Amino acid sequence: MDRRSIIKNAGMAGILAAGAAPALVHAQAAIRWRLSSSFPKALDTLYGSAEVFAKAVKNMSGGKFEISTHAAGEIMPAFGNLDAAQQGSIEIAHTAAYYFFGKDPTFALGCIIPFGLNSRQMTAWMYEGNGMKLMREFYAKYNIINFPCGNTGAQMGGWFRKEIKSIKDLKGLKFRIGGFGGKILEPLGVIPQSIPGGDIYPALEKGTVDGAEWVGPYDDMKLGLNKVAPFYYYPGFWEGGTQCDLMINDKAFNSLTPEYKAIVEAAAAQAHIDMQAKYDAKNPGALKQLVGSGAKLREFPKDVMNESFKSAMKIYDELSNTNENWKRIYADYSKFRADQNLWFRFADAKYDSFMQAQKL
């Protein structure tokens, strides 16, 4: 499926949802699928995108196509749902692909890599560049067809029990971080910890970790991270625009009628837009509340940023020499990133920089 078919099918699904083609809807067999998310219900924006998707599918199909949504741990562990979807134990994994970095670092390119594309650029690469095509070719090896289902936008850099004044303060630091971020920070002395979202608070509270990153103000406040670590750092340079995905078992998806396939595509697109809109609306107020309750905002020191960038580029080059999946997709990704960076430098970056300097 290319981007034109997605647009065409989304239009078809809209017609079905509006009731303009009732014969098509009523002719479909009733279907019941299960979706397992990597996120807890408490995170109503992350987990909520699965609910938005499932509700849209139900509405567009006139109630004939129902998808039950399950939070992390209910029917599958947070990081076990990809395997479950691959094997057909469930139809859909709702997740962030970089959680499966250990299987193949290439998974991260379908989600986010440090110093990678921002949310708009990622959506552009997926829908108007080669991103969707390349990632689907890769996921096919895992019996998966992916659909973007939300983006968090740029994230914060996490909560720390002590200040990070220079790169020296990273040595021996036990830091909860997902995906590729841990790999680029490891050479700088960080000890990465992979912990599901619902377990971050107790780990930080007990001192099992010295710091932890999650998403941004709204979700971090939901988890109460400000109560167990005072220093809130920015930017989250390892997650400049993190995409979530629906990873659908290919046999299950291919068994659908064209009308139901169109509905799935349209519902995923709706959920994709919904997630970032909610984050952009909710994060400003949440940040004010966090600062008002005592959170101490800090910017990462320049040496941390510079050395992290060097570490990332070195690792990307090494992977291009050892991993054929990575080499093929990253070549396209990095070219797209360079072109986007050039354009954004003259448009968004200059505009945003000016506006940030104004008193509004």
Where are these regions (language model features)?
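N-terminal secretory/targeting leader peptides
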Residues: D2-G19, L24-M122, N130-L360
